[in-house]
Amino acid sequence: MVICLYGASSEKIHPDYITGVEALGRAMGRRGHTLLFGGGDKGLMGAAARGTKAAGGAVIGVAPRFFNVDGVLYPHCDKFYYTDTMRERKQILEDQADAFVAVPGGIGTFDELFEILTLRQLHPAGGGFSQSAALR
């Protein structure tokens, strides 16, 4: 299963969240799931990627080209999609995922989460958008 994770890219996050999201990533990797995420190396995005990779899972990043500067993107992705815009990034995340998980984050995380919840409401299961969504 390809699981899209939305979460903080900031390093200004409580260490307990980092620990918890790394554990979530390890659990995903152990179960053979693939992490699909915004490609960030820091914050909860990076924690999820490190945890998933440490447990042998695959990691796919998606980010606009303008984020491709030293230290911003997770360097150990199995595959990386570069986009021209944030909207294209969100579309790839939506199209490629079987399920979505939102962990603590900021405005970007809320934007991504609310779009998924809106799609679920507008297209109930069987109506074109049947992926699952969860908050952690």
Protein language model features and the residues they cover:
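A cross-family phosphate/adenosyl-ligand binding-site feature
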Residues: 1-96, 135
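Conserved phosphate- and dinucleotide-binding cores of soluble alpha/beta proteins
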Residues: 83-95, 99-136
